[in-house]
Structures are given as C-alpha cells and as structure tokens.
Amino acid sequence: MLLLANLFWGLSFPTIKAMTLDLARLAPGSGSAFITAMSVAPRMLMSAAVLLVLQARDLGRTTALELKQGVQLGLFAAGGMLLQNDGLQFTAASTSAFLTQFYAILIPVYLAVRRRRNPGALVWICCALVMAGSAILGRFDWLELSLGRGELETLASSLFFMGQILTLEQPRFLGNRPERITLVLFATEALVFAVMGVATAPSAAALALPWSSAPLLLFNGLLTVFCTLGAFLLMNTWQPKISATEAGLIYCVEPIFGSLMALALPALFSRMAPISYANETLTWTLLVGGALITAANVLLQLAPRFRRAAAAA
C-alpha cells in the first residue's frame, strides 16, 4: 500500500511543476514564496474540508494524542516542503533530489544510536543501493556539490521528512485513528501555507487565482484526490505497521514514479494550460537508478521471508 502512496506522490512532480509554471504566468509579479504557498494551500484546504465533512459526527471524540500527532506530522511536513521548495531555487534539481533522499540513511543511523543496536548488514546494503540509485536517477555530480544555501536547506528538509516518518512509528500513538490524524495534519498545513500565501501575495486578486483558473482547478483536483487524500491516508494507515527504516527505503521509490510520469504528462498538461513544459525522455539513468532502488526494496522485503523459510525447514 505504501508503494501505491509513492505512485500517487509521483504524480505530484509533473503536476506541481505545471501548476507553478501556470501560476508564474498568471501572477508575473509574485515571488517564489507565494507560488510555493499557492501550490500547497488549496489542496490542503480542500482535503481538510473533505475529511471534516466525513468525520463531522464524531469530531468531538478527537483525543489529545490524535491532535498532538496530527499537529506534529503537519509541522514536519510543512517544514520539509518549505525548505525543499526554497532550496530548489539555489541548487540543481538533481542535487535536490539526491539530498532529499538522505533520510534513508539518517533514519537507521538515528535509530542505531538511540537504541544502541546495529540494524544489520542487510539494512546498510539496502541503504547503499538506495543512495546509489537516487544519485544515478537524479544525475548527481559530486564535482558540482558545494554546501551553499540550497544544499543546506535541502538537507534540513530531509531532517523534517525523517521526523514525519519517525512520528508515525512512536508507540504512544499506535491507538490513534489514521483518518483523524490525517485531518489534523491537513488543517495544520493548510493554516501554515494559507498564512504564508496571504503574507506574500502581490495583491488580493492573486489569492483567487487557484480558484478562478480552470487549469489550476484541474491540477489542484488531481493533487487533492491522489497526492494528498490518497497518499497521506495510505501513509498514515499503513506505515505504522512496518519499521521507520523500512518505510524510509520504500519512500525512495517515489522519484521513480515521478520520472516515469514526467515522460508523458508534461505535454498533456501543456495542452490544458498555456505553458511550455516538455516531456522528459527515457534515459539509462532512469533504468539503472530505478533498478537499484527497486532491488533494495525487494531485498529488504524478501530476505526476512527466506530466513523464516530456512528456519522452518
């Protein structure tokens, strides 16, 4: 189910790119902060509204732990998205893609130090495969890497995403209802990005753009149904059933789906909105990088089963 969440998040890459291009066209005087806010706030508001309607009857039964976990998840997600989007303006996309996946290494390192227990050779091998695959997939160039503002912000965003993953693993939250914490998460992010949008809007009319443009409504609809409601409900429901280390590695599949969708969707979106957004092409980096990330996840999933089968025999 988490792979399905990755598929939905993969759709967000070309969709958000198309949306930001259209927003920049419709509001040429706006800054990057406003465009970032307007690419997130509407779908969070709509997603929160949908869940609010569905849960209205027993909303009063929301527990303090559900509120606490939902707010924590929302703040971690909002912080990660803010830093990632801002950092992308000061570094190459390939560098951003690679450094964002750094939580795949940070999670097992953090847990090993905290629990004083080595997770085992298999986990470290899978981490190495994932990082190598992410580097190849993003065409990362070590020679061009310098720790400037963009790189530091992207690394910081990875810490926030790690916090989001670890928050879902905490035992004290295991009794929380996924749909309830997801509602609180959406409301938290909606508030953060709505305030940011109002504070950075070039004019009051610019705030109405996501609701008055047919292409933007379509993009927001896709992001709301699949990348927000679908993906986050799946994540919050199923991730607590596995370890944070395993989840971190599985989430690294997301760029593969994003790269595959970028092979066809940009041209389609360019026909829906008057933007220039060309399809990407199939390259060896997608095939090799994707194969390494897939191999790491297959190995992580199958190895314990082989050990159990051998022990039973």
State what each model feature region is:
Residues 1-4, 30-54, 68, 125-132, ...:
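Hydrophobic alpha-helical transmembrane segments of multi-pass integral membrane proteins
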Residues 1-38, 75, 79, 83, ...:
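Glycine-/small-residue-enriched transmembrane alpha-helix faces in small-molecule transporters
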Residues 10, 14, 45, 74, ...:
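Hydrophobic/small/kink-forming positions within alpha-helical transmembrane segments
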Residues 17-30, 89, 138-147, 200-215, ...:
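Membrane-interface helix termini and inter-helical loops of multi-pass transporters
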Residues 100, 113-136, 147-151, 267-296:
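Loop-to-transmembrane alpha-helix entry segments
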Residues 44, 245, 252-313:
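C-terminal-most transmembrane helix of multi-pass membrane proteins
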Residues 38-41, 45, 83-121, 155-158, ...:
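Specific alpha-helical transmembrane segments that line the substrate/conduction pathway
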Residues 56-96, 134-136, 224-242:
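Specific transmembrane alpha-helical segments of multi-pass solute transporters/efflux pumps
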